[in-house]
Regions:
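N-terminal Rossmann-like dinucleotide-binding module
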Residues: 5-35
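NAD(P)-binding Rossmann-fold cofactor-contacting core
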Residues: 30-53
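Short, surface-exposed basic-aromatic patches at helix termini and helix-loop junctions that form
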Residues: 25-28, 53-58, 125, 144-156, ...
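Conserved N-terminal glycine/acidic-rich loop preference
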Residues: 2-4, 9-12, 44-45, 142-157
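Rossmann-like NAD(P)-binding element
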Residues: 38-44, 62-129, 134
Length: 210
């Protein structure tokens, strides 16, 4: 099986720890040759990188793991690039800091879109065929900006698991198996509605979930 080269942009995020553990756990299903963390804030990224050094030396010693603040080093010859950028504006002004809707979402989107577009232009210089998995919020706004800027790039995937998480938690509270549900979701990723929820087995509308 091919071993992949992967870069995580925003390596200083605490969410990166979950990715590192997942890569170590799934090395048989998704084997890696190289894993690089990239962040513009080297000090913030350093403890995450040190954690990776220790964990991979014990659980994945053959992995080529590193962390850097140099985009040329981070983006070179990658197969997959995970994007996780976060900007902070509203909280500094005493406003709601929700990152996908309202004033926070709009401000976040205006900043994230610019940085995302710049990052992807850089990535394509070094890894033109890499799959880019973006989960920077506000996901819907960033996805639309990337679609307009890179209309022919079919290897940019925009991901959010919030709707699925809502279905999982709600079904558990109400005593249903979420895998038996067929939901219809409308709206932004953190600001939407389930207009219908059907039973996959019968096709009937599940009034108990509404």
């Amino acid at each position: 099986m091919k071993k992949y080269n992967v870069c995580i942009v925003g390596g200083g995020s605490t969410y990166t720890l979950g990715f590192l553990k997942s890569f170590a756990r799934m090395q048989e299903e998704f084997p890696l040759n190289k894993l690089v963390l990239f962040d513009i804030d080297g000090e913030r990224q350093k403890p995450i990188g040190q954690y990776g050094d220790i964990m991979f030396s014990e659980r994945y010693p053959e992995l080529d793991f590193s962390y850097t603040t140099d985009p040329a080093e981070a983006y070179q010859d990658m197969d997959f690039i995970f994007m996780q950028m976060r900007e902070h504006i509203p909280l500094a002004h005493g406003k709601i800091g929700q990152e996908t809707c309202g004033a926070g979402g709009m401000a976040y989107g205006l900043r994230s879109c610019v940085d995302m577009i710049e990052a992807i232009h850089q990535i394509r210089q070094y890894s033109p065929e890499a799959w880019i998995l973006n989960y920077s919020n506000p996901a819907a706004i960033v996805a639309e900006a990337l679609r307009r800027e890179f209309p022919d790039d079919k290897k940019i995937l925009n991901i959010c698991d919030q709707p699925e998480n809502v279905v999982r938690s709600t079904s558990r509270l109400l005593g249903y198996d979420w895998e038996d549900l067929d939901p219809v979701y409308f709206g932004l990723n953190h600001y939407g509605w389930f207009t219908h929820i059907y039973d996959k087995n019968t096709g009937e509308l599940m009034w108990g979930m509404i």
